[in-house]
Amino acid sequence: MAMAMALRKLSSSVNKSSRPLFSASSLYYKSSLPDEAVYDKENPRVTWPKQLNSPLEVIDPEIADIIELEKARQWKGLELIPSENFTSLSVMQAVGSVMTNKYSEGYPGARYYGGNEYIDMAETLCQKRALEAFRLDPAKWGVNVQPLSGSPSNFQVYTALLKPHDRIMALDLPHGGHLSHGYQTDTKKISAVSIFFETMPYRLDESTGYIDYDQLEKSATLFRPKLIVAGASAYARLYDYARIRKVCDKQKAVLLADMAHISGLVAAGVIPSPFDYADVVTTTTHKSLRGPRGAMIFFRKGLKEVNKQGKEVFYDYEDKINQAVFPGLQGGPHNHTITGLAVALKQATTPEYRAYQEQVLSNSSKFAKALSEKGYDLVSGGTENHLVLVNLKNKGIDGSRVEKVLELVHIAANKNTVPGDVSAMVPGGIRMGTPALTSRGFVEEDFVKVAEYFDAAVSLALKVKAESKGTKLKDFVEALQTSSYVQSEISKLKHDVEEFAKQFPTIGFEKATMKYNK
């Protein structure tokens, strides 16, 4: 009885006339739709599509104005932070595209969501281009392009290849290393890496400013690490990957090269590549590589060796690393970032990109020379990459105070620890780099001028320090804010810096479209 009633109801429903969704020839019908067009602007069925398709300046003028202010800052200032760059318009277009809308947990061809045909295409193309950019054989190397940033990518490698409380060696943070390599003090585990793994630093030879490889080898013999990191955030010299490879082989340790800072230089082939020696290579994608904010993990695959028994031994990194990324430590990847990265990696294989990276090195060398000629003490005595690390102690001032003055005159640099510092809270150095300004078209002679502005800021900082009523940083800041003479000098230097910087092109946006373009 119930079945018969259900069938009669279904038959009645089927026999009802249906109106087309768009037109009489449309394949899609639905009886409940009104006669007028669904997206009739004058008589909309719903109101939110209009809001969703309105531009930012209409929907949120406050945020739009903040973005315009940031554009003006980038145009009028000198960006010297070595971990920053100006990515291209095409990369930003990809990052701001509809690719941000899609969820895609899993990997190409093996997703936990439907509708990923084009997401798979973008990620696969990104992987292909990543291997091509670094001239890698896809039979010997693989790459995961899903890590959200550099620190997570390093932790994903540790999680994949180590057991809890296994041992890691890496360059000490005050000597140029990075937090994600397991930094800790005598009293506190600063990085979470040092909570889950046992870490020991290797350091520079303070008499030369170069990594002390002899001491590294001795420490490794005693510590017996399972993994050694070759990578830095404030080391102006090239790594001796071959030397660390020998130490790793002796200890049967994994060699992880973290090339976050230098990957653009490596891609262009203007400095030695870690891929000849490393087992795993990580990198961020937004520093010298000049892509969107993300990261990659490269790993060896295929035949590793033939053992003493004549048996072939293969690398087992691929599955372990992929599983550590997802589902181990991440959910859905950021597909808009991966798409933007694919664009950046295509750019990284062009002649223009190599010319840019060559200029980055030339500018860095000239900048270092100009600073040295002005009496500045450079850690290691110079540079072989994109950055310089200035030890300010011989000038009688520290990085924190100089950074405050630089900020006020529109020069962006960052305070940094240098060998011999007793506190990371009062670092003795300033870290500066050339990638961002080189993207804007700066050449060697321009960095001589930048060195002059830096020197003027340091001189001003010394005057402020002399006028300070106390020895603490807050006393210095108070003098900055209250001295009419200091305010006048800052205003003059800021004006000179801005007029100089405004001569150069903007990257990613046109001056003519800026709200604050005066």
Curated annotation (Swiss-Prot):
A Gene Ontology cellular-component term: mitochondrion
N6-(pyridoxal phosphate)lysine modification, residue list: K287
Transit peptide: 1-31
Catalysed reaction, written as an equation: (6R)-5,10-methylene-5,6,7,8-tetrahydrofolate + glycine + H2O = (6S)-5,6,7,8-tetrahydrofolate + L-serine
Cofactor(s) essential for the protein: pyridoxal 5'-phosphate
EC number: 2.1.2.1
One of the GO BP terms on file: glycine biosynthetic process from serine
Subunit and partners: Homotetramer.
Family indicated by similarity: Belongs to the SHMT family.
Protein name per the record: Serine hydroxymethyltransferase, mitochondrial
Organism expressing this protein natively: Pisum sativum (Garden pea)
